[in-house]
Regions:
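Short, glycine-anchored, charge-dense loop/turn motifs used at functional sites
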Residues: 21-29, 60
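Short hydrophobic alpha-helix segments
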Residues: 32-33
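Signal that preferentially marks extracellular ectodomain short beta-strand elements
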Residues: 43-55
Length: 79
């Protein structure tokens, strides 16, 4: 079992992408910005909040936003 989530995505351009994780109540618990290159990209979320605390079991939402398009995916954490 891993405490990490590998997030893989494709980009058409060199662009800045904002990643956010929200809890079921819509509160942002973690966020970062990443520079993306054309093609496949990936990064690892360590399963922690912005304060470095491990998040508890539950439903979360990952949002990727490049300024033109926003994608949201549901994440279920089971500890």
């Amino acid at each position: 079992m891993s405490n990490q989530l590998k997030i893989e995505y494709e980009s058409l351009f060199n662009t800045q992408i904002n990643f956010s994780i929200y809890n079921i109540n819509g509160q942002e618990i973690w966020a970062t910005e990443r520079r993306s290159r054309p093609g496949k990209n990936q990064f690892i979320w360590l399963g922690t909040s912005s304060k470095g605390r491990q998040v508890s079991s539950g439903i979360y939402f990952l949002t990727l936003d490049d300024g033109n398009k926003t994608i949201q995916e549901k994440i279920t954490i089971i500890r």
